[in-house]
């Protein structure tokens, strides 16, 4: 055992042992409690960054701790391998996306191995492998057969740079989430999965996720956006269809002075066909920003279509406007405008000098309608037969009236829209459908799956290369045998990441999407990833899990029992990025200090949920601590080996009750730290685990070894310390555990048990304050009387109370504090 800590040698030795023993390969064991720990699998960009290091170390620490508790632990890893960056690299560098992706995976896998993460590599999944996406295609066909998949023309979010459709969730402040380009509105034929059919369950089952952050659950509630309201029907002059309007405030119906439709509403297009100015307005809105945050602040613009609707109660005509603040994907793409009682409608009415009709009277307050809209509830006025009703009552009465007259109905509305999964790109899972002029849409037969991406394609940077590949497109219809075309769209990459966690459980299964192993391992017990996935990946995965449950593939209702959302890694107060020049290279960090130092720092520097501020001095401090632990262990190696031999031979018994007081006191501290650290591990508070380990080490390194019992105490304490540190710094703990003669490998050692008798103590440390200021400390017996404690306090604080009158002595038992009040 070298005197000097050499992390590279230590880490290579530990990793070779784990590889040789296949330490982290796991199988199902019904006699053990299972624990499935999973960090969101990475996109193979080519290199790990410090955010990766933090995220995957968090998962590894949890997995190793749960294993030490005796559970059957699965921690797999894989690659979310499809996506635009690979295709963009193909365009830029003239390299096939598959080749670029495989090269990146190899580089990142090497980095993961150097970090020492306890992965079951035999379960490694790469989503661009046909054996993976084959089952995604198979499942999509099952959903199609159930009526949960459909294709229709829809106005979509079009990214003009990436030349593809984006889901609503992929539009951030009006821009594409990857390219940053301003998103345009475009009508295109798209594939959808009916996530709205599961909206109620997706909402209600959030209540069962007790171990999810409240913020994430609220974000999903808001995104699903359930509201109870009324659908109102407006007949339109010289137009064949009624306009359907959804509102949560039917009590304001009598105050409607105009209607507004979205720029891509069929009525707007009808109006534009006969009105040049309307068409010009629609053209000017083509690049409209569609994020709700943008809508709240952008200029409200519109134009009168010249068409009118009939008020369903009064029969009066209302003008119909096209407005840029109405979105087709929310509600029906049309709104009832009540300027007196909706601020947005009021602003629009002021701009275009439209009527403002008050129909709600505020209760006990005055309101100036020349300044703003009154948006709260009140008493109805100017509402004919509904006058004098409270808003709460009027909502029901007016809804009933509309239902009786076939002019509306009570309804539940959702903000959530069906999931558009079509992407007009090459590097994704081919959608397994065939379009035949004779038969329409025909699924690819199961025996012809997977539909594999062709390799003989050209990457021009515009549109989908698949549309230009005749060998791929031109097929025979499996139903009628006539010439047909293969679907050239590929899946949104969120489809692959919506079920990968279940496939990890039964990697290698060639005859089914999932098998009974998925039922054993799911749900994932601990999932780790960023909060930015709250309304994309996490919602889609919950939806997919319910789809798989209803297909009989899994038993549970939810995919992830507990969720940990880690904070970002910052440097100089900013997120690390190449453009800011504040990136820390994990390879350099590991080469300089070792993986254990990197792991220790990212666990110690901040609680997991909070942002971590990078600190070079913090890294050096973590490294110094590990060097001290190594040096101490080396210094006492022979003694510790002898004690181990005694214990293994059955001669290592110590009666701790008979030990001297200083040993009892130190042992009390060690087991206090053990109890607290175990509690902190259970709460994922790893920063306080590390601080506890540092306190424990300081306690034993300062301890004077004088008796045989002292040696056993040091042995017991170093055993506890190494096991507490092992999930966080596994390499150094593995080597020290072996070199100090402990039984088995530390990866197989049980979690240390708290000796409750050690937590009991005969003595208590007290602090003495004089007029609230700390002046002294002393130790007293646990059964000392108040008089004895006060006398001891006066004695130890003598220099501060001499020549003063002690007016009062206050003992605070639970804080071990005595305050002397002097005059």
From Swiss-Prot:
GO terms for molecular function: aminoacyl-tRNA deacylase activity; ATP binding; leucine-tRNA ligase activity. PROSITE patterns: AA_TRNA_LIGASE_I (PS00178). It catalyses: tRNA(Leu) + L-leucine + ATP = L-leucyl-tRNA(Leu) + AMP + diphosphate. ATP binds at residue 578. Gene3D superfamilies: 3.10.20.590, HUPs, Isoleucyl-tRNA Synthetase, Domain 1. Keywords: Aminoacyl-tRNA synthetase, ATP-binding, Cytoplasm, Ligase, Nucleotide-binding, Protein biosynthesis. GO terms for cellular component: cytosol. Its EC number is 6.1.1.4. A motif ('HIGH' region) lies at residues 42-52. A motif ('KMSKS' region) lies at residues 575-579. Its main location: cytoplasm. It is found in: Cytoplasm. PANTHER family: LEUCINE--TRNA LIGASE, MITOCHONDRIAL, LEUCYL-TRNA SYNTHETASE. This is Leucine--tRNA ligase. It comes from Legionella pneumophila (strain Paris). The lineage of its organism: Bacteria, Pseudomonadati, Pseudomonadota, Gammaproteobacteria, Legionellales.
């Amino acid at each position: 055992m070298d005197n000097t800590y050499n992390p590279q040698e230590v880490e290579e030795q530990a990793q070779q042992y784990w590889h040789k023993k296949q330490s982290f390969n796991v199988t199902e064991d019904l006699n053990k409690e299972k624990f499935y720990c999973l960090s969101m699998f990475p996109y193979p960009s080519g290199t790990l960054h410090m955010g990766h290091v933090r995220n995957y170390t968090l998962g590894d620490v949890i997995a190793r701790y749960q294993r030490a508790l005796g559970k059957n632990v699965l921690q797999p890893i894989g690659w979310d391998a499809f996506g635009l960056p690979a295709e963009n690299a193909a365009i830029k560098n003239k390299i096939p996306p598959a080749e670029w992706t495989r090269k990146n995976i190899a580089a990142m896998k090497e980095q993961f191995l150097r970090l020492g993460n306890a992965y079951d590599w035999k379960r490694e999944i790469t989503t661009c492998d046909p054996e993976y996406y084959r089952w995604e295609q198979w499942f999509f066909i099952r959903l199609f057969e159930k009526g949960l998949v459909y294709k229709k023309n829809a106005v979509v979010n079009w990214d003009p740079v990436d030349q593809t459709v984006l889901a609503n969730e992929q539009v951030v402040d009006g821009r594409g989430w990857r390219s940053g380009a301003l998103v345009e509105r475009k009508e295109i034929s798209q594939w959808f999965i009916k996530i709205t059919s599961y909206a109620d369950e997706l909402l209600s089952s959030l209540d069962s996720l007790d171990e999810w952050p409240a913020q994430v659950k609220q974000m999903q509630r808001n995104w699903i956006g359930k509201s109870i309201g009324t659908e109102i029907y407006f007949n339109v002059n010289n137009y064949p269809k009624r306009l359907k309007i959804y509102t949560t405030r039917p009590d304001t119906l009598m105050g409607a002075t105009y209607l507004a439709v979205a720029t891509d509403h069929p009525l707007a297009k009808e109006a534009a066909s006969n009105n040049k100015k309307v068409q010009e307005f629609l053209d000017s809105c083509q690049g409209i920003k569609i994020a709700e945050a943008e809508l709240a602040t952008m200029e409200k613009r519109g134009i009168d279509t010249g068409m009118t609707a009939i008020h369903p109660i009064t029969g009066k005509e209302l003008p119909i406007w096209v407005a840029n603040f109405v979105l087709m994907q929310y509600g029906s793409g049309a709104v009832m405008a009540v300027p007196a009682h909706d601020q947005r409608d009021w602003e629009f009415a002021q701009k275009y000098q439209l009527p403002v009709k008050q129909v709600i009277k505020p209760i006990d307050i005055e309101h100036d309608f020349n300044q703003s809209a009154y948006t709260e509830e009140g008493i109805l006025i100017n509402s004919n037969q509904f006058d004098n009703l409270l808003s709460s009552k009027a909502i029901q009465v007016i809804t009933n009236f509309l239902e009786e007259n076939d002019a509306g109905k009570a309804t539940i509305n959702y903000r959530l829209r069906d999931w558009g999964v079509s992407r007009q790109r090459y590097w994704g899972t081919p959608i397994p459908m065939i379009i035949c002029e004779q038969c329409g849409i025909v699924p690819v037969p199961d025996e012809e799956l997977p539909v594999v991406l062709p390799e003989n394609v050209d990457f021009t940077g515009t549109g989908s290369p698949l549309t230009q590949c005749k060998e791929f497109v031109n097929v025979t219809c499996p139903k009628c045998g006539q010439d047909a075309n293969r679907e050239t769209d590929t899946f949104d990459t969120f489809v692959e990441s919506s079920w990968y966690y279940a496939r990890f459980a039964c990697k290698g299964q060639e005859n089914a999407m999932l098998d009974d192993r998925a039922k054993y391992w799911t749900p994932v017990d601990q999932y780790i990833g960023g909060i930015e996935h709250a309304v994309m990946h996490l919602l889609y995965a919950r939806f997919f899990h319910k789809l798989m449950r209803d297909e009989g593939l899994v038993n549970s209702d939810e995919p992830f029992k507990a969720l940990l959302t880690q904070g970002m890694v910052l440097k100089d107060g900013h997120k690390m990025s190449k453009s800011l020049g504040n990136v820390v290279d994990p390879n350099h960090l590991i080469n300089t200090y070792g993986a254990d130092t990197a792991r220790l720092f990212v666990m110690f520097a901040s609680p997991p949920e909070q942002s971590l501020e990078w600190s070079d001095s913090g890294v050096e401090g973590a490294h110094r601590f590990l060097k001290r632990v190594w040096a101490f262990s080396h210094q006492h190696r022979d003694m510790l080996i002898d004690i181990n031999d005694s214990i293994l031979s059955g001669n290592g018994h110590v009666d701790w009750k008979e030990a001297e007081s200083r040993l009892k006191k130190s042992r009390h501290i060690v087991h206090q730290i053990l109890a607290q650290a175990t509690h902190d591990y259970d709460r994922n508070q790893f920063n306080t685990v590390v601080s506890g380990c540092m306190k424990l080490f300081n306690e034993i390194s300062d301890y004077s070894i004088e008796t045989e019992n002292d040696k056993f105490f040091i042995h017991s304490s170093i055993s506890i310390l190494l096991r507490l540190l092992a999930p966080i710094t596994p390499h150094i703990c593995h080597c020290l555990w072996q070199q100090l003669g402990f039984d088995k490998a530390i990866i197989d050692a049980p979690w240390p048990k708290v000796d409750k008798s050690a937590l009991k103590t005969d003595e208590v440390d007290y602090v003495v304050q004089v007029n609230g200021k700390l002046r002294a400390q002393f130790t007293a017996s646990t059964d000392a009387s108040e008089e004895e404690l006060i006398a001891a306090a006066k004695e130890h604080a003598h220099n501060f109370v001499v020549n003063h009158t002690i007016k009062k002595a206050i003992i605070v038992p639970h804080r071990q504090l005595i305050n002397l009040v002097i005059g």
